[in-house]
A protein has these predicted regions:
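Helix-adjacent hinge/juxtasegments
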Residues: 69-77, 81-88, 92-94
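Short amphipathic alpha-helix that is part of the acyltransferase structural core
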Residues: 1-37, 50, 54, 150
Length: 150
């Protein structure tokens, strides 16, 4: 099995377009929306980063940091978003290492706490995330769990 390489988009700006296309494919959010959030990170205008794991030149996992991940708790910011690991790489700690890298970079920039919304239980707690309440999804679709990492 190929070795895993973890990097931020700042470390590999040539991955801007492939990363935006990959996130679009996984989540259905327009590619342009990802590019609009990735470019300020690349230019240094924002510390809200994008993180990738590569295996043999292919993206094996990724996540980003944005102001708000489509919920009504706008006061809980920033948010980890778009956490995804390709099925063949699950169970190898890919998401955990990406989460740790994002939290560490944000903390180094003086940004803490960090939040995320998810319906998963038990996974994020393994990486130091603490359940802190519920938020209503944008559009009123339902409630989702909110986690915090200090």
């Amino acid at each position: 099995m190929a070795a895993l390489e973890y990097l931020s988009l700042r470390q590999a700006p040539e991955l801007l377009n492939p990363a935006a296309a990959w996130f679009h494919e996984k989540w259905g959010v327009p590619r342009e929306a990802y590019l609009a959030r990735m470019r300020p990170y690349l230019s240094g205008e924002s510390e809200y980063g994008w993180y990738l794991c590569q295996a043999a030149g292919r993206i094996a996992g990724g996540l980003g940091v944005i102001d708000n991940d489509f919920h009504d708790r706008k006061d809980l910011s920033p948010n980890i978003c778009a956490v995804y690991t390709e099925p063949e790489w699950r169970g190898r700690g890919v998401a955990g290492q990406l989460l740790d890298a994002a939290v560490a970079d944000l903390r180094a920039a003086g940004i803490s706490p960090v939040y995320l919304v998810t319906d998963h239980t038990g996974f994020y707690e393994r990486y130091g995330w603490v359940f802190c309440g519920m938020a209503r999804e944008d559009g009123g679709w339902g409630l989702t769990r909110v986690y915090r990492h200090d």
